[in-house]
């Protein structure tokens, strides 16, 4: 279980195949017992700077694959991450409270989020007060997963300045291309998110899903609410052959989403049209959606 802590100017992590489900490992090499309940991350970078990971293949992780935590200046290049479609919590790459991250030329197909950007959960994230910011995701391919690019739901330190460009996505088991999720306990902000030049063959859910009332198991519920502000989202230059839905956006009544722009979409076939509510300033420009059923529900 590779864990790097407080490493700087780390040499390349060079090409190799890493698998985490080896059978019959000698007892002295086992990290967790067969009946243990804790599923370990595959690779964690904690408080690290200037790390370059290139050309590795990671398979069958029991939990998140690559987890940069409170780290900066990380490049992840030409990485392949594969986990079964039905394997829970096997996120591909999860930058958390990290900045200046580049993820490029990589292939991810997993049982949960392909890339999930986080910054801590509830009080832990607020006390840490370290956003994830300045993240570039470029020229990547996503297949199975709950989302291609996901922000949240653990974002209580904030997420800002994310650029996703020139990516390909295709699988009926990929449930969203871009997803943002939070709830009334997370707080903080999501702002300045751009996704552009995305090619999608088939996707099993909406191209964009934003949910500010995401219901997850909460252990820190209090009477005090912490609403998340979500501002300045641009999704442009989208080519798609089939999507289950164009977009599904549920903003918060208490703090509506502001400034969403969808521009230059060409979607050949969608099943359920579009739905959105609780948005201030939604701009649609040059949007072509060819729907089978009801086209729109706007509230």
Predicted features by range, described:
Residues 1-299:
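Extracellular/periplasmic carbohydrate-active domains that bind, remodel
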